[in-house]
Amino acid sequence: MISNEQTKEILDAMVNKKVLAVPENIKDVVQVFKDQTLVHQLYSVYKDQRLKKYYLSATIVYENQNHMIDEIKRIFNENKIDFILLKGSVIRKIYPKHFLRLQGDIDVLVREKDIDLATKVLVNEGYQQGYAWLHHIEFQKNNMIMELHHHLFKDPKQWNGYFVSPWEHALKVEEHEYKFDDIYFVMYEIAHLAKHFKGDGAGIRPFIDFYYMFNDDKVDFENIKNEANKIGLENFLNSIYNVIGYFFGFDKVKYQPITYLNDYVEIIIQSGTHGHSKNSNYYANRLAGKKQSKFKFYLTALFPSHEKMKLMYPYLNKYPILYPWARICRICRCIFVKSKDVNKIEKAQKDIERHKNVYDEIGLRS
């Protein structure tokens, strides 16, 4: 691990184009920033030739993702399917250099009535259909992942129903491509980040996104505050201001300092991109985000839902009759192997009070 202060120094150098001396713990720095999907940006900070490979690799990934985005646009326009690009495909355009904002996958929203047609035309174009979640379907092509959304969240009615009708907030770009209005886009990004924190956790990258988003002089902070109140995320919005203020300095809007900021920042650094770095304990994040007994949580974690079981044991997708056998395998693994999940849950008990303090203050305990 590296300290909060060192992380802050590196991030400040990234956004303000400063060059730092290569530290003695450069291997630790590289590992942390790999976990955060930010390692490619270290080359501009240290100008160390050993880091150039990450920088060059990022440009290749960016071009490949660009090609996929252009292909998706063509496919949906040719088949008269309305669509909205989500998340990183939009956010990267506000970065000084677009390729600096990498994406784990490409997210696209279509109208619910078009989901079957969209699936069909993608498969016809060589996209391999994967797992179907409640709100999106996964596709893969050329080792890249696309998520085809028909809803923005698994439960569209959460966040007080704010995201039930996203197309009412859509503005036409050209042909069949649409985009969200600015406020709705920001609200979606805030709620999406909150979802990750209530799940396995989230890392630094979204806060860099918000730093660039909120540094636009046209941002209507009063409107953002009012909309955040509507979805119950006013405290979480305030916490975002605190974090980008800590890392980069931020004076575009007044915000209330939070008591557990250092713990909050440490959790973010430990989490990695989506809570699965070696130093992260996503069970502590999950347990902190829910007001339920440890016993109930322990049972839920060790005996996952049917949906999660299918991810852990892919053969269930093809042979659902083997579900009882998969349950037996899971129970035996927990009892006799002392699995990674068990170890993480035990460690979570030590971390939980710190996490609860943070989650209470940022408004994500439910």
Language-model regions, residue ranges each:
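Conserved NTP-donor binding/palm subdomain of two-metal-ion nucleotidyltransferases/polymerases, i.e.
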Residues: M1-G104, V110-S366
